[in-house]
From Swiss-Prot:
Family annotation (SMART domains): HDc (SM00471), KH (SM00322)
Gene source species: Campylobacter hominis (strain ATCC BAA-381 / DSM 21671 / CCUG 45161 / LMG 19568 / NCTC 13146 / CH001A)
Annotated protein name in UniProt: Ribonuclease Y
One cellular component (GO) term of this entry: plasma membrane
Transmembrane annotation, as ranges: 1-21
Topology class, membrane: Single-pass membrane protein
Residue stretches making up the HD domain: 333-426
Keywords for this protein: Cell membrane, Endonuclease, Hydrolase, Membrane, Nuclease, RNA-binding, Transmembrane, Transmembrane helix
SUPFAM superfamilies, per database record: Eukaryotic type KH-domain (KH-domain type I) (SSF54791), HD-domain/PDEase-like (SSF109604)
Amino acid sequence: MIEFLIGLIAAVVGILVGYLIARKINNANYEIFLEQAKAKAKAIEFEAEGILRNSKISVQEAEFEAKKAYEDKALKLQKDYNAKFDEISKKEQTVLTEQEILKDSREELEKEKKSAQTIYDEGTSLKKTYETKVEESLKLLERVAGLTEDEAKSEILQKVEEKSRAEIAHIVRKYEEEAKKEAKRNANYILAQATTRYAGEYAAERLINVVNIKNDDLKGRIIGKDGRNIKTLEMISGVDVIIDDTPNAIILSSHNLYRRAIAVRTVELLVEDGRIQPARIEDVYKKVSEEFEAGIQEEGENIVMDLGLTKIHPEIVKLIGKLKFRASYGQNALIHSLEVAHLAGIIAAETGGDENLARRAGILHDIGKALTHEFEGSHVDLGAEICKRYKENPVVINAIYAHHGHEEPTSVESAAVCTADVLSAARPGARREVLEAFLKRVSEIENIATSKEGVKQAYAINAGREIRVIANAKLVNDDEAVLLAKEIAEEIQAKVQYPGEIKVNIIRETRAVDYAK
C-alpha cells in the first residue's frame, strides 16, 4: 500500500515535473515564433514602403511626362494660332486695301459720271438754246415779212429805246459822280465857313490850381498844429493840399474839377479871413459848396440865354452848368459843348436845317458827362435817359446817340452835331489821351471804394497813389475798418492797372455834440 502510495506520489510528481518542463519548452518556442513574426512583419512593412516609394516616383514621372506633353501641345497650338492669326490679319489688311482702292475708284467713277452728266446737260442746254434761237429767227423773219409800215416803225423805235436806255444810264452815272464831287466841295466850303465864323476861347484843363498868399507865414497856419487843419481840409474836400518851397503859393491838386474849385475858393476865403481851424474850415467849405450849387444853376441859365434857347427843364439847365467842372481828355466839357452848339448851328443854317434846334442838340449832346461821377453807365446812355425823362426833342436824343455811332443821324440837325463834334474834338491839341487814361484810372479807384458798404466818401490823392476812404462810424467798427481796407486793396489790385503801389487809408471818426444852456 505504501509502496503504491509512494509510486502514486512519484507518478504524480513525475507528471507534474514533466508538465512544467513541457510548459517551459512551449514558452520558449512561443517567444521564438513571436520574434520571427515581428521580423517578418518588419520585412513586409519595409517591402511595402519600397513599393509605395516606387509608386510615388512612378506617379511623379507620369505627371511630369503628362505636363510636358501638355505644354508641348499647348505651345504647338499657340504657334499654329499665331500663324493663323497673322495669316488672317494679312488677308484682312489686303481686303481693306482693296476696299480703299475700290472706294477711290468708285469716287473717281462718280466724279467722271457727274462730269459727263454736266457736259451732257450743257450740251442739251446749248442745243435747246440753239433751237430756240433758230425758232426766234424764223419767227422774226416770218413777222418781218408780214409787218406793215407802222409795225416796222414800232419795232425800230423799240430797238432805239433799248439802246437809248443804256446811254441814259451812262449819263446818269456820270452826273452822279459830278454831283458827289460838287457835294464834297460844298461840304468843305460849309466846314470852312463854320470854323472861320466861330472862334471860341479854349485852354486845356490842368490837374492843379495855385492859390496865392501874402506871405509864407500863412502856410504854417494852414497846416495847423500837428497838421490838423490841412488834414481836415483834405478830408472834407477830397483834394491834395501841397505846401512846398514855392514862395507865396499853395497848390491844390485833384482830378475832379468841381471838388478842386470848391477847395480853391475855401482856401482863398480862409486866407482872407485869417481864422484857420478845423471847425472854421468845415463851416467855410459848407458855405462855399452851397454857393457853388447855386452858381451852377446860374451858369447853366446864362449859357442857355446866350445860345438863344428856350423851354429847357431846370434840371437839364443845372446839368449844363455842371459841365463846366467836367473834362474829357483834358478838354473842358462845357467849352466843348459850346463849340459843338455854335458849329452845329452854322452847319445846319448852311444846309437848310433848323439852326436853333441844332444848337440845342449841340449843347446837350454830351450832357451825360455831368452825371458820370454819380451814376454807372456811358455818358451817351445817361444823357439820352435824362433827355427822355424831361421830354426833349427827338432830334436832340438822336444826336446824343448818333455822335458816338449808336444810331444813324435821322435829320440835318443830328448830322450837323456829329460833324461839329468831330471838328471840336479832333482838332490838334484839343485833347490829351494820357491825361484821360489817368483820370479814368483815378475815378475807377474811387468807385471801387465807394461801392463798399459803410463807406461815405472816397478821394484819390497824391496823383492816385493813395485812396482816402471816409467810413461811417455807426456801420464800421475798428476791426471791420482793417478788413475793409484789405478788401478795397485786393479789389483795386485785381481790377485796376497802375504803376507802383496804392495806399488805402480808412478814416473812421466819431463826434459827440451837446449844448450847454
